[in-house]
Amino acid sequence: MARQLRLSLDQENGAPSFAEFVRGPSNALAVNAVEAWPAWQGGCLAILGQKGVGKSHLARAWAEAVDAVVVDARDPDLDAAAGRPVLLEDADRGVSTEGLFHLINLAGREGGGLLLTARTRPSTWPTALPDLRSRLNAFPVVEIEAPDDVVLEGVLRRFFRDRNIRPPEEVYPYLLARMRRSIPDAKAIVKRLDEAGDEGFRPVTRVLARQILEAQGGLDL
């Protein structure tokens, strides 16, 4: 079999976009909610989910589509945020409470909007500001669940395509049945398959996939 020409790509090309975001049952509610902007309640929405489910990609796809300002959670630029849609990631990890309060107020004004990403619900975040407490308790949320097979297969295909690799179709169900349910893990597997193929001048096959999963401790028999 002729060896495939491969590209070394450790990062995805270009800015995140809705077109590149792989949709499936695990993220359908979140995608629909994000695309409903600017009709969010109070101009606000929080995307919740554990690491590796696609929160950041979806949030940044929205930011790219609506030309949102991406602000620093610890020191948000309120002047830049005025009259603009705003993205604030990891909002449950060291955010400025006063800054967040002002961003929520700005979100309800014309041209505004505030999209947060977090692992925990806003209602559980600590704050000594009574007004912010009430806002966080009522903050609209939508959750992305662990990636389902539709999403994982889609991202595997995209990561393989980014590296100009065309594995046999049998590789996909084999990986899906055994890999961890995480987009970063999917990316790591494809990267390692690419590297292993280059090192041994081997095509990506089911046999190579098994070897990589065993080596990474990701085989779940």
What are these model-predicted stretches?
Residues 1-36, 198-221:
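A short, basic N-terminal segment
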Residues 42-58:
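Walker A/P-loop nucleotide-binding motif
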Residues 63-75:
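Post-Walker A helix-loop "phosphate-sensing" segment adjacent to the P-loop in P-loop NTPases
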Residues 72-106, 110-120:
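Conserved P-loop NTPase "ATPase switch" module shared by AAA+ and STAND
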Residues 122-137:
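Short regulatory helix/loop adjacent to the ATP-binding pocket of P-loop NTPases
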Residues 139, 153-166:
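Conserved AAA+ ATPase "sensor/coupling" helix adjacent to the nucleotide-binding pocket
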Residues 139-151:
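Conserved AAA+ ATPase "SRH/arginine-finger" region at the nucleotide-binding site
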Residues 173-177, 184-198:
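C-terminal helical "lid" of AAA+/P-loop NTPase domains
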